[in-house]
Design a protein with these regions (language model features):
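A residue-level marker of the well-folded mature domains of exported/periplasmic proteins
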Residues: 1-121
């Protein structure tokens, strides 16, 4: 369908999703770059009675609960601890004159109904 900015805001994602549902009756999925926007998309889909695959990023508590309840398809959790650890490792190596890799991979965690309980507090 396309890409539109919702400026990281739940209400803008909701109105964008409402517009898309109206324009594209065959819409199947909405992928959001944060969970606030995924929750806005979810609110729009539920208000319209539309069953969509909706995925967000961040693993915020209400999104995780929506995943557990079967309302949100998934959330992708960035590993902030892993990112911080990699930065510290690189800084230490640079500080002592060691060579560092040009790229580090810190895996993301896909949170679905199968593993959401591991992330809920």
């Amino acid at each position: 369908v396309g890409t539109l900015s919702a400026s990281w805001q739940r209400d803008k994602a909701m109105s964008t999703t409402e517009d898309w549902i109206g324009k594209y009756p065959d819409l199947k999925a909405v992928i959001c770059e944060n969970d606030d926007m995924s929750m806005g998309a979810l609110q729009a889909a539920e208000a319209e009675g539309k069953d969509l695959v909706i995925i967000g990023v961040d693993g915020i508590s209400d999104a995780l609960q929506a995943v557990k309840d079967g309302r949100l398809s998934a959330s992708v959790l960035q590993d902030a601890d892993g990112q911080a650890s990699a930065v510290i490792d690189v800084a230490v190596k640079v500080g002592v004159g060691e060579e560092v890799e040009s790229r580090y991979n810190v895996p993301f965690q896909l949170i679905t109904a199968d593993n959401v309980d591991d992330y809920l507090e």
